[in-house]
Amino acid sequence: HFSMNHFFRRQGATVLASEVCRASIHKKMNAQVWVDNLRGRNPELGRDIDTPQELIPHIGIEKHATFTPGGERMELIYMGHGHSPGDLVIYLPERKLLYAGDLVFSGMHGRCKTCDFGGILPILDRLMDFPCDTVVPGHGSPVVGVGTEGIAIYRDYLVTLQERIAELVTSGVSMEDAKTKFDDWKYFNWGRPQLVHTAIEHAYKDFVWRSRFEHFQALHEDKD
């Protein structure tokens, strides 16, 4: 998806992304200022980049594409907005292997700044229907030999996170205080502990925004 640590194309390969992701990169990165910004933030990565066009994927996939590299079927499927607006998964049916990307984290916390907490759960439910033995997450170790168990665990992570956030917000607990209310959460000690409060913050903001939006909708429906 669109993130500084997720794309480059100077290695000679044809780069594919969902069309939503490709268009986002094209819109935001097709300016020299982004190249200059990248060089300033990470000189080692940015030193070999000459033009913004080098950052844009070659091909955008609208919904679904099938490739057969080496004679093996590989399906690229756009899932919608879960972790980010451009979520794309790769499925190898013959191996029962699913590359889930950042739709799934395994045993570690992650940044959920662009996550649609309402949209990602139905997407995870769809992924649970994929016949697979191994799931490769966006972050964390592959979940091997247990089918979609890794997806189910991350789904529970998100559900329990949102349930507690809902309780805290409804009780009037501030976002900063909410970060102190998760020490007994069963996923609190996952890897990358420096990001647990980031995940809580993003979930808190998402819940508040959705609550306000639903309230706004209800007011307009009453007027109609």
Where do the protein language model's features map onto the residues?
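Di-metal (Zn2+ and/or Mg2+/Mn2+) metal-binding site signature of metallo-dependent hydrolases
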Residues: H1-Q11, G86-V89
